[in-house]
Amino acid sequence: MARQPYRFPQARIPERGSGVFRLTVRNAMAHRDSEMKEECLREDLKFYFMSPCEKYRARRQIPWKLGLQILKIVMVTTQLVRFGLSNQLVVAFKEDNTVAFKHLFLKGYSGTDEDDYSCSVYTQEDAYESIFFAINQYHQLKDITLGTLGYGENEDNRIGLKVCKQHYKKGTMFPSNETLNIDNDVELDCVQLDLQDLSKKPPDWKNSSFFRLEFYRLLQVEISFHLKGIDLQTIHSRELPDCYVFQNTIIFDNKAHSGKIKIYFDSDAKIEECKDLNIFGSTQKNAQYVLVFDAFVIVICLASLILCTRSIVLALRLRKRFLNFFLEKYKRPVCDTDQWEFINGWYVLVIISDLMTIIGSILKMEIKAKNLTNYDLCSIFLGTSTLLVWVGVIRYLGYFQAYNVLILTMQASLPKVLRFCACAGMIYLGYTFCGWIVLGPYHDKFENLNTVAECLFSLVNGDDMFATFAQIQQKSILVWLFSRLYLYSFISLFIYMILSLFIALITDSYDTIKKFQQNGFPETDLQEFLKECSSKEEYQKESSAFLSCICCRRRKRSDDHLIPIS
């Protein structure tokens, strides 16, 4: 009898009204819904990582943010240049007046400072003459000055100058017998000389006991006075003039008691609002135009700040969608590298620059309105913001492969460079402290830590090598030999070894980036997920209009339809 072939039982087709049929349809719909959700997420991710030009070609979306950034660069740079020219006039006026004051009030001033002090005296007669010369010049100021200067009130609201002297309380000294008896308590005596006192004839103030100085006890004599001036050169730039208060101080320093009294001159200029300005012409109108321009810059920066903040918020929402989807489908979290891809550092840079530009523009408007006089703080904000704005241009250059190498090389080499600099910095600090303590008494460039650090840094760049070797004093043969060993070892170590290794780190990162560009970068989970997009484009084209409608309707029920715009 022939053996019949085995027949597999046929699957039972569920009837339309049965529960199995409804479950099958529900599973199919859930699968279809999951696929649509995945495709929508993949499409949003792909659009987010596009360049502005690619976004325009993909959806005809005008890159408003790119245009706004270009306009902001032009406006901020123009604002900085105008403020820089105005600030240059302020600095020049202060420096010129300081030089004029030194020639007016310092007897025998040659035009160049001897060191950190202006000049010096070596005899008692020269000391008395220098003190009396400064006082007499102050009295005759209006007759001898070439500038727009006048007398100002001091802290006591009195017009005049104040003379103070510091000296030890009491003591006797006999150097020939090597005998010293002194009380190291310091006394401070001051006298106020008004214009009326200085105008008396004969000038009896010179014969007062206050000016009988015992130089072996004297520590210093300080002459302080206030002057007022008006900067008229701003009118040529169609700006309102500034009124200045110069707080001048002349110090005769005898603390070393070395037979040399160093004379220091310090002038602290403060800008004050002029009480009564009557200027005819277009200067006032020009100031109003500048204020309107600054207000327009603030509006542009506010718009840029809002757009970048919005993009970061939407990027974080998109990141949350991707993390939840990845965890739900693949049952594992996304790596940290992929998570940081959603945090656009350029947006953070733009936000910081916008905030600094807004603050700097407000300060600049207050300065123009003569309600604020702090040019330095405004310069820091405007200068730093302009620096960040121009650095942000690199982001758009990075879309081109030829320019992107610089950005990728900096990103790849930065961690290694920072670790290397930390190690090299320890050696650098060691040389700094050693040079300061050993060579400080014998070399001008090693007198303090700040100067030593600057000197060593210039040696690394190859500057002033011969001058550094030649200026060492040869009073001590031991120190002279140590200086040669110190300088030769530092130059050899940092130029031929540390600096070469520093360059090698950057070169290695550059070579690695070039290989990756030729052979492809290692793909992360995010890149592999986006790579599937190209393989499913045909499916997206053949998808029904009903599914597209469902996808759009589902996205409208939440904030997922908001896609970050670059």
Swiss-Prot record:
Region spans: Extracellular/lumenal pore loop: 107-123
Ranges per topology, Cytoplasmic: 1-65, 310-346, 398-419, 503-566
Subcellular location: Cell membrane; Late endosome membrane; Lysosome membrane; Recycling endosome membrane
Catalytic activity line of the entry: Ca(2+)(in) = Ca(2+)(out); Fe(2+)(in) = Fe(2+)(out)
Membership in a protein family: Belongs to the transient receptor (TC 1.A.4) family. Polycystin subfamily. MCOLN2 sub-subfamily.
Subunit comment: Forms homooligomeric complexes; probably tetrameric. Can heterooligomerize with MCOLN1; heteromeric assemblies have different channel properties as compared to the respective homooligomers and may be tissue-specific. Interacts with TMEM176A.
Protein name, UniProt field: Mucolipin-2
Native species: Homo sapiens
